[in-house]
Amino acid sequence: MKLLVLDGNSLVNRAYFGIKLLTTKDGRYTNAIFGFQNILLNLLSAHHPDAVAIAWDEKAPTFRHTAYDGYKATRHGMPQELAEQMPVLKQLLTDLGFVQVSKPGWEADDILGTLAAANEAAGGTTLLATGDRDSLQLVDDATTVLLATNRETLPMDPAAIQEKYGVAPPQLIEV
């Protein structure tokens, strides 16, 4: 099975910051919803997956917060204009039949890695769509990261990572 897993938080942030603020006639913000849908439709059209899952972060602290007090301490909260769009986007995705996955104490990255490993164990291949370069360490012969950049989505397989960084994917954690 070819599984496409989207890092929802990463991609919705790219959509939000990549498109000027759009609103409905009654003033509701829609730019993140519009941009995320475009990203999703482009991925579906380009890759024709057998199954799709969208992973989301939860607000609950993770084990990383317990291990390191400063984990993401300098991150700013979600802009209010984006926060207002999140329930609408998630409901739209539910209404369209997309599986959405989140778990308290887990980040979307953790879910991406877990789903990729489970799908690989079942004999499948996985595409991980994200703008987070940390996910590149998950790449192997059965898992490709579709790395969202400012202009394009780059398919990052083991050969592409070796060429760009000069190391194998598991070694990226040391770079």
Placement of each model-derived feature along the sequence:
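Extended two-metal-dependent nuclease catalytic cores across DNA- and RNA-processing enzymes
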Residues: 22-23, 73-175
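Non-catalytic, usually N-terminal nucleic-acid engagement modules in DNA/RNA processing proteins
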Residues: 1-53, 57, 63-67
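Short N-terminal helix-initiation segments at or just after the protein's N-terminus
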Residues: 64-66, 72-75
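Conserved nucleotide-binding/hydrolysis micro-motifs of P-loop NTPases
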Residues: 10-11, 59-62, 133-135, 151-152
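NTP-dependent nucleotidyl-transfer catalytic core
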Residues: 3, 47, 58, 70, ...
